[in-house]
Amino acid sequence: FSNIVESILQEKDRTEMRKNISEKYIDACIIKGSDDTFHFAAPAKRPRELDEIPSPYLTGLMDKFFDGRLDPYIQASRGCPFKCTYCVDGSDLVTKVNRFCQGRLSKELEYIAKRVPKNIHTLGISDLNFGSYKGDLELCDMIAGIQKKYEYPRALYVQTGKNSKNNIIKVMKKLGDAVKLTMSVQSMDKSVLKNIKRDNISEEQMMELKPTIEESGLQTRTEVILGLPGDS
């Protein structure tokens, strides 16, 4: 969308603006031309240095949304190394995982905790495979510090990674019962998994984790998707 706006602002002749824009190839956009053909442009270029993107919290853009109805969300990383065909993030364009720096995340957590209304207890983390990386362990330490200082967040909403479960359990232990361990399978049918290009953690590995999960008192949940290719 920002690419379209930028192209519009570059137009000097407003009377011909619509016609000129419809004949352009604008990155990350599909445009219907004046001749009714579609122009497919190059995919969007992903920023490698995520900290170049201004923080919507630290710049004050999110202040009006601390309204007692919405849960704050932060993002520590972008990208996903997996290629599940049902997922928009399974594209080759986003397989590289990039992270925001820990200093920025620490400031965002402090900023949110100081402003979140008393009736809001949940913090969302919109990473695709939270707990799979070393930086996530450090982030959990920061969140634990914020919890001790502000008694927030009492609950975390995260999507934990489907592999490296032992590492994820170490991460989850730092946050106690504030977070649940997600062990999504999407399907247990091997032919369906092949169709959607997904490799689940093996059943043997899953069962090996059971004693550790019970000992730690972790809450768990799973997810399945109905109607995947080959389901019926």
What positions do the PLM features span?
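Glycine-rich beta-alpha loop elements in corrinoid/cobalamin-binding modules
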Residues: 1-45
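Generic detector of ordered secondary-structure context
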Residues: 21, 45-46, 97, 135
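Walker A/P-loop phosphate-binding element recognition
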Residues: 44-47, 74
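Radical SAM [4Fe-4S] cluster-binding motif and immediate context
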Residues: 51-216, 226-228
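Catalytic palm subdomain of template-directed nucleic-acid polymerases
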Residues: 231
